[in-house]
């Protein structure tokens, strides 16, 4: 999975089992504290590993690069990830790159959000939302 450094914006690869650990950016060597932004899911195996190892709820943003509302909501998702740090993992799934996940969870419109607990979806909603709404919604899962 990829975590973006807040200092130099380099995308750093992190194993799902280490998302709660602190690390160091491979480029600028600044600390990569856990939960500072959304985790970019690279493949189905990483997604499954994240859900299997998560000890907190996982909020997933299903999006696509061509989707205007998805682009508009991206900063809101990032803000929600910072606010929810330690209480919820926030992940992003590009439905164009990972259509199997979109099909598995019956994503028919984007942006779509699902909250998972113990590997199972417990909440879902579709459409653009503000960070405070995401925090309120996902924080109660």
Segments from the language model and where they lie:
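Short Cys/His-rich micro-motifs in 6-15 aa windows
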Residues: 29-37
